[in-house]
């Protein structure tokens, strides 16, 4: 199959910064079954049909971290949509084989709550662990195929953190 003709999945990503300028990352539950068992990522997820990117970002943040809307302030939105392609070994295996990668709208949000407001044991958990990390180290701890995208998001948001 020619995967290059597949569309990109619309997605919202969240760079969640705390008061100390550190960024939330989660370790996916399925990471142990992948070739990247130590990889982390920022919250992200698909934009539903008819949903705008900001609403999707807030929904995904709640679904993945338990953080409710009143505990975050949106500081910025990416000036462009960022794309990434899935590596060959994942093409046709995730998202029911309908997409070649993701087209992401990113949001920088300030977390105004306390760490105990974070609960990754949600109805449909995606993360097994979470931590606050130095934003400049993000590209080093994520899956290789998203590193360029994370570098671009960092370049845009780092001055605002």
Where are these regions (language model features)?
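Acidic, metal-coordinating catalytic segment for phosphate/diphosphate chemistry
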Residues: 1-15, 19-20, 28, 96-97
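A generic structural micro-feature
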Residues: 6-8, 36-39, 97-103, 124
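Short, hydrophobic/aromatic-rich beta-strand segments within well-structured domains
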Residues: 13-15, 24-26, 105-109
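Conserved Nudix-box catalytic region and its N-terminal flanking loop in Nudix hydrolases
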Residues: 19-70, 75-77
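Active-site-adjacent beta-strand/loop module that shapes the phosphate/pyrophosphate-binding cleft
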Residues: 78-117, 131
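NUDIX/MutT-family hydrolases
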Residues: 103-113, 117-149
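C-terminal alpha-helix
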Residues: 152-160
